[in-house]
Amino acid sequence: MENEEMKPSYWPSVIQAAIIVAVVTTVVGLGLVYYVAGSEPSMGVMMISGLTIPITCLIGLIGGILATRSYAKAFDITFPIGTGAQIGLFTGIIAALVGGINGQIWNLVDPTLMERFADTMIGAFEMNDQIPESQKDEIITSMEEGFEDQSSMGGILKGIAINAGVLGFVNLLSGMVGAKIFASEEE
């Protein structure tokens, strides 16, 4: 312990990267949701909506790399990949929280967006001829209940928690990669 030098705080880098990730994923996610909500119901629209989560997740995983790069370059320091993992984890969790807040703010700006999105998705599913009507009715009821649950306080908190877990994990990994690339310890 006595040989360890005091390292500067990584929190400014974590917060900066988390805000960047949250804003970019919010904008991309909103763009895709607006596209679907403004489209005619079709299977193509359902496929596009299915890409929303993977695309925003791929964008979201850069947070750990951004934060570790920022921290390493700002202070011209090296640190182990464990510290990179920690930086990435915190970046992902904070990005999820900020993204959740962004989403709720946007619900105040356009309160009917998610309703229009749900209507388009359900309409697209209703057009599917390959599913028997009895199964289709059950699935549509389940979709409607899912959309209602997502707009409740419990659903919102559950969504933020899931997002924090996913973004925390992928950024833990990308933080390790960032530490290896930008802050490899001297040997």
Each model region followed by its residue ranges:
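Alpha-helical transmembrane segments with an aromatic anchor "belt"
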Residues: 70-93
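Selective recognition of hydrophobic, aromatic-rich stretches within alpha-helical transmembrane segments
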Residues: 44-71, 108-111, 152-176
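Alpha-helical transmembrane segments of multipass membrane proteins
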Residues: 21-32, 59-63, 95-103, 166, ...
